[in-house]
C-alpha cells in the first residue's frame, strides 16, 4: 500500500518521514496555503530523498504552464490537482507532462458526488478522495463517510484521505480498500510541521495489519 504524507515544508522532516516508511511525499504549491513551499524549497527536499520516493506537487486551479514549469524546475515525479479542474484539463495536462503521475483529488460530499470519479479515470493515473470543506481545499482534519466508499471500485488506483490519523487508520482500512492512504494534519504539530512520533505510530498501526 502506498502511504503519502502531504504538506511537507522541512527537508529534514522529509528525509525522516521517508525513512519511517512513506512511499510518497506531498508538497503544497498553493500560495495561500499555510503549508505552501516554493519551487526552490521543493527542489532542496527532493534532492535529498531516495530515488524510489514519489514526490507530488499539490496544485489548485493553476495553469498548465505554471504546473509544468514547477515540475521541471523542482524535479517532482507527480502532480495532484486539488481544485476544480475538469476532465479536459487533466487530458491537456497529460499531453504536457506525459511521464508524470497525475492525481485528481475529489472532495466528496455525498454518494452522488462520488459518481464524478468515473469522468476522470481515463485521463489520470490515480484518484484521491478527500473530505469536503466549504472553505479549505485540504488538510482540514475532517474525515469522509467511509461507509459510502465501501463499494467504490474505480478503474484506476486511489488514495483515501481526509482526517486520517494513527488512531483511526485501522478502522478506516477495515471499511474501505484503497490503493493508498494520504495524511497531512493527522500527523502534524502545526500546519507544515510534522510530528515524527505520530508518523512513527502510523506505521506501527499499518504494520500491525499485515
Curated annotation (Swiss-Prot):
It comes from the Bacteria. Keywords: Amino-acid biosynthesis, Aromatic amino acid biosynthesis, Isomerase, Tryptophan biosynthesis. Pfam families: PRAI (PF00697). Pathway: Amino-acid biosynthesis; L-tryptophan biosynthesis; L-tryptophan from chorismate: step 3/5. GO terms for biological process: L-tryptophan biosynthetic process. Its EC number is 5.3.1.24. Gene3D superfamilies: Aldolase class I (3.20.20.70). GO terms for molecular function: phosphoribosylanthranilate isomerase activity. It catalyses: N-(5-phospho-beta-D-ribosyl)anthranilate = 1-(2-carboxyphenylamino)-1-deoxy-D-ribulose 5-phosphate. Signal peptide: none annotated. The keyword Amino-acid biosynthesis applies. Belongs to the TrpF family. PANTHER family: N-(5'-PHOSPHORIBOSYL)ANTHRANILATE ISOMERASE. This is N-(5'-phosphoribosyl)anthranilate isomerase. It comes from Nostoc punctiforme (strain ATCC 29133 / PCC 73102). The lineage of its organism: Bacteria, Bacillati, Cyanobacteriota, Cyanophyceae, Nostocales. The gene is trpF.
Amino acid at each position: 500500500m502506498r502511504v503519502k504524507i502531504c504538506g511537507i515544508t522541512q527537508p529534514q522532516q522529509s528525509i525522516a518521514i521517508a525513512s519511517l516508511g512513506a512511499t510518497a511525499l506531498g508538497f503544497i504549491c498553493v500560495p495561500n496555503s499555510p503549508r505552501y513551499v516554493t519551487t526552490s524549497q521543493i527542489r532542496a527536499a527532493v534532492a535529498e530523498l531516495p530515488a524510489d520516493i514519489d514526490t507530488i506537487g499539490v496544485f489548485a486551479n493553476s495553469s498548465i504552464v505554471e504546473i509544468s514549469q514547477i515540475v521541471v524546475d523542482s524535479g517532482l515525479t507527480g502532480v495532484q490537482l486539488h481544485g476544480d479542474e475538469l476532465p479536459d484539463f487533466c487530458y491537456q495536462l497529460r499531453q504536457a507532462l506525459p511521464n508524470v503521475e497525475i492525481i485528481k483529488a475529489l472532495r466528496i460530499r455525498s454518494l452522488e458526488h462520488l459518481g464524478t470519479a468515473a469522468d476522470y479515470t481515463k485521463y489520470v493515473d490515480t484518484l484521491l478522495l478527500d473530505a469536503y470543506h466549504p472553505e479549505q481545499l485540504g488538510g482540514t482534519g475532517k474525515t469522509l463517510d467511509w461507509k459510502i466508499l465501501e463499494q467504490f471500485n474505480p478503474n484506476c488506483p486511489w488514495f483515501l484521505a481526509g482526517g486520517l490519523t494513527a488512531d483511526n487508520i485501522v478502522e478506516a482500512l477495515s471499511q474501505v480498500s484503497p490503493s493508498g492512504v494520504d495524511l497531512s494534519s493527522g500527523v502534524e504539530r502545526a500546519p507544515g510541521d510534522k510530528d515524527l512520533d505520530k508518523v512513527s505510530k502510523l506505521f506501527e498501526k499499518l504494520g500491525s495489519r499485515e
